[in-house]
Amino acid sequence: MTHLYAHIRRAGAALTLLVSLSSICSCDDGAIEEHHQPTQETNTYTLRFCANIKGVSSWNGQYSVALACFDSESEYAKTVKTLHDTDADEDRDTILLSGVGTDISTVEVAILSPLRRRIATIASFKISADISDSDTIVIDAGDIEADMFVSINRFVFQGNNCSRCHSGSSPASDLNLSADVAYSNILNIPSVKSPSTLRVKPGDADNSYLYRIITDENIGSHYAHTGLFTDAPQQAFIDIIKSWINAGAK
């Protein structure tokens, strides 16, 4: 009888342990499930971004083009997704981005620093402030040109007022930097100020007049072009231009 009672006690203890372990496993499974299914407390939603993106593969150096989410308070992206060129046999890419916070105000195809600071915005899409975490936001962005030189042309030659002096029938230093002719007027063309130096010498930024005039205050120009690059995003384009030239200026 004593032996039978001992067996019953051991069986009861084993059953209690089994129930306890089962409870632990159930809690773990529940936590994992909740982690992957956002609730009202997570304040996030899913973004579906559709676009035909070209030129991303032309980028080199420390700066890159990415799909980035920004709030209204900071120049640093809160969520980032790496981009690639849309394949030739595809109409457009579809990019899914989950866990996007409801504090995000814009979704951008942007040039970013290694620390995810916005250098320039290639395309921007405003997010409504009244979204809920159960929403899936769909953005059809159409065609986006993200080529490295196209960005230099847009944000430096045109956006930084270079073409104000370097355009028209009598451009400064006989250099027309209007958007449609800027590339052909700088590549392998001797500088008027320094005929022995090419404006852009592919593969050699240090010996390209374009790079030298924006980095050297003593180059001899009557206008200090270094003054065009004063804040951090503009200064970043000095490195971007250098990387573009050293990679072959394509």
Set out the residue ranges of the language-model regions.
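C-terminal motif of bacterial Sec signal peptides marking the signal peptidase cleavage site
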Residues: 22-26
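Aromatic- and Gly/Pro-enriched helix-to-coil junctions and flexible linker segments
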Residues: 27-92, 100-250
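Acyl-donor (CoA/ACP) binding surface of acyl/acetyltransferases
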Residues: 96
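Bacterial N-terminal signal peptides that target proteins for export
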Residues: 2-15
